[in-house]
C-alpha cells in the first residue's frame, strides 16, 4: 500500500510507500513510528475510510477465498475489518443509542453479536454509564465503551488506534487480555505494551520506508 501526503497533488511526497504484509488469524501486528509518519492513516486506508495511491487489501473470508473491499462491498468490509479510533467521535445521545443505531444497519442484522455492556463490565464500565451522554463520560470511559461496541460486533480484524491511551495500568491489562485471541493491527507508543501483545511489528519511518520484524 502506498499513500501520498496529499492525494490531490500528483507529485506530493510519499507518506508511506509500498507497505506490504500479511496477518494471520489471532496475530497482532503492532504499528510503530514517530508522530506524523502515517500510522493512523494506514489504519484508515485499510478500513477504506481514507483513499490511498496504490495497493490492495484482501481478506480471507469464511469461504476461504481472498476478497477485496470491492468484492465484498464497503459496508461488509468495514463490518469485517473494523477501525476503532483513539478518540471516539462524540455523537448525539448515549452509548446505548449508538449500539441501537449500529444494530439497525442492514449489514449488522444477520451477524452474531455479543452484549457490549457485559464486555465492558469486566473493564470497570458499569451499566449506568451506557445511559449517560457521551460528553459526560471521561476519555477512558469513552475509549472502553467504543472498544466494547466494536468487540460486540465480532469483526474478523480490529484496527486499533492506541486503544488504551486513556486507561490506567490495571484497565490496560484487562483490555489487553480481552483482545488476546483477536486478530488486530494495533498502534502503540508503549514499548512494554508492544512486548506483551505483538506477534510482529511494523515500523514506519519518516522517509516513507518501513521495516517489518
Task: Give short role names for the model-derived ranges.
Residues 80, 87, 92-112:
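Q-loop/switch helix immediately C-terminal to the Walker
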Residues 147:
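Hydrophobic anchor residue at the start of the ABC signature
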Residues 56-76:
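ABC ATPase NBD Q-loop/coupling interface
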Residues 133-141:
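Conserved ABC ATPase signature
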Residues 158-162:
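Catalytic Walker B motif of ABC-type/P-loop ATPase nucleotide-binding domains
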Residues 47:
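Helix-to-loop junction immediately C-terminal to a conserved catalytic motif
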Residues 32-34:
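The feature captures the beta-strand-to-loop junction immediately N-terminal to the Walker
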